[in-house]
Amino acid sequence: MHEKYVPSDVESAAQGQWRATDAYKTTETADKPKFYCVSMLPYPSGKLHMGHVRNYTINDVMYRYLRMNGYNTLMPMGWDAFGMPAENAAMANGVPPAKWTYDNIAYMKKQMQSMGLAIDWSREVATCSPDYYKWNQWIFLKMLEKGIAYKKTGTVNWDPVDQTVLANEQVIDGRGWRSGALVEKREIPMYYMRITQYADELLNDLDGLGWPERVKVMQQNWIGKSFGVNFGFPYELDGEQKLLRVFTTRADTIMGVTFCAVAAEHPLATRLAQGRPDLQSFIDECKHGGVAEADMATMEKKGMATGFFVTHPLTQEKVEVWIGNYVLMSYGEGAVMGVPAHDERDFAFVKKYGIPVKQVVAVEGETFSTDAWQESYGDKENGVLINSGKYDGLKYGEAVDAIAADLKALGLGEKQVTWRLRDWGISRQRYWGTPIPIIHCPSCGDVPVPEKDLPVVLPEDLVPDGTGNPLAKSEAFLNCTCPTCGAAAKRETDTMDTFVDSSWYFYRYAAPDAKTMVDARTDYWMPMDQYIGGIEHAILHLLYSRFWAKVCRDLGIVKFGEPAKNLLTQGMVLNETYYRENDAGKKTWYNPADVTVTHDDKGRPVGATLNADGQPVVLGGVEKMSKSKNNGVDPQVLIDQYGADTARLFTMFAAPPEQQLEWSGAGVEGASRFLRRVWAFGQANETALTERAPFDAAKLADTEKTLRREIYSVLKQADFDYQRLQYNTVVSAAMKMLNAIEGAKGASAAVLRETYGVLLRVLYPVVPHVTFQLWRELGYEGEFGSLLDAPWPKVDEKALEQSEIELVLQVNGKVRGAVTVAKDASREAIEAVALAHEMFAKFSEGKPAKKVIVVPGRLVNVVV
């Protein structure tokens, strides 16, 4: 074997062997338990980043460890290939999104292969392939048949200059990202999926998942089950008696209503604006700005009084209706009751417009003033009703029950369960996505594309220009024949939300060549035993994929109702940031590789200069690696310099998988040094390590017994840590093993071979290349088979047995040293050894022992 460890040579040789034997191709078998571990598929943005490296290495380590333990394991990979970034890149570069996407896939796949990942590439999928998105279209039509998918009007961001719909992230401070025009809200017909139909099940089934509690709580909050009262404020308009309906979780405060507010799109607002230019102008103003919920929550709250009054259902008092820009038509009834004394948003609104405030809940020991909002004003748990007539003195629950009963008796309302969750709007007015399989016929209306005509293929040669959907301008795509009547018709030009693509790709990995959406192989592998991805996907992707599983189950497509038994959300990768700020306050960020840092005598950074000019830069602190902060580390540069195994070892050792990982150049160097030591020991002891001599464990020298005891003791812990996914302590265990082996002077060749073989197997899942090559070159393969399938080492329990044990020695309860005694020593023998120990003589100060306390296996305490 080579004298020096050359990562590029070692990794090239190992990967060549794996390719030649198709080492990671997996088939279904009943002979072994299966384990399906999946990393969230990447968007093909162009290059891998360190977050990818960490995620895929975690998956790879899991795969290799479980394969050694007898599992039929599968690690697939694919590409979340549709989406807006490809359109933006296409506009910037003047190339079709398809070319940009496929070029990126090719490069990123090459990067993954250089990492030595155990991916079964025969199962690769790309969501932009017609073979894949055909099944998006097929199941959409099935959902349409069952009423799970449906069409209704929805609100979107409209850029009046570019004449296009904008995604929420394309609206910046209320303006279009390209044109700078004020964005308008526009109502257009869109397709939705009834995820709300599954709200209860989505909420209840969280209990049975092995997912982080944080993710479960985020989903619980997003689903948002609320218990409240739905009721109406009566009014008369155009000679008709009507109700302005609202939903509230604080029906106890109904006697404190001083106004009602409706959304700009509410039918009542539309009616009241007739003949009222001032109201119409305000409604038009409300329709500017983004529709994202976060934008709505943070924007300035504005309103306009309509001069129209509804009737309070219990007091018969008149309540004025306002139009409010903060009221969403898509939430609840599109109207809210205003109780400024006990709702912080309402409080701020009335302070601005001079609307009265009426306190109806009092908290003992708290005073009430309209000068400023206090947290106690919204306290429902400790409040008692006042100024509420017959409800005075009631607490929250009692008050809600009584008020709901009275509203029901009047025929004006009742208790209701509502959800924060809204149906999933899947229509996107964009080009690069799955075409929605609908044909618009002037005679027949909206006609589903027949199953035999699927897929509706997306043309891949179009280049977006930012002025509307290219599909709407493509005659070849747009023009078609109605499948019902044969008349000339037009295709739907909206495409599906890319979350549709990512809701089920793990089914297709199992059966990538199936002539149906899934087959028996899908039920063999699914649900995933382990899913790995970032916490940022906790709500949308993970919730939609759970919904998808339940729908597919109910449609008889699959047998499972949850996509993943267990979820690991890996921590972010962090790095130092450096910048300079110009006079206008604009920051220019510099990559850490281009900066020299000075440290104080305690190793703390105290200054930094840019290598290019030697001038100072500001230390910006440690933040998530990102393009915006220019603090990323290119994995390819790292692999080219140190090798994939070093990159893998560092990312596994630096932090537990679920915690943040702070990048460290010194840590990378340390990982590289450790692998050189592992190689150097194998090279220096090649002759001894290749001998297959048996040994009698009972006749070993003390140093050999000590070495075996330490190796198997550490192995026990490493095995436990692998099972807990605590790979950082697995690496620590391997380091202890190497230290012990290097320090075992005089150990026989047979014992060195045994213990070094254990080390290689413990390290293999983390650093597969170097261990695979050492295993082959030192002859272990002939004895145990390829390291890919070598059995996980078993702990030799006899090696852990000790003829002597060490007990803590205490004098008057204080630790003064340790004594070594025979494992089966009697109490009398232990006392004798303790009393004869030099530490007893020193700390007893010549006083005789009054009592000796022996705690078997732990300590001996001499009382003087």
UniProtKB/Swiss-Prot annotation:
E.C. number: 6.1.1.4
What positions does the record give for the motif labelled 'HIGH' region? Answer: 42-52
- So where does ATP get bound? 627
PROSITE patterns listed in its UniProt record: AA_TRNA_LIGASE_I (PS00178)
Q: Which SUPFAM superfamilies match?
A: Anticodon-binding domain of a subclass of class I aminoacyl-tRNA synthetases, Nucleotidylyl transferase, ValRS/IleRS/LeuRS editing domain
Per the record, its GO cellular-component terms are: cytosol
Superkingdom of the source species: Bacteria
Motif interval(s): 'KMSKS' region: 624-628
The protein depicted here goes by the name Leucine--tRNA ligase
Which organism encodes this protein? Paraburkholderia phymatum (strain DSM 17167 / CIP 108236 / LMG 21445 / STM815)
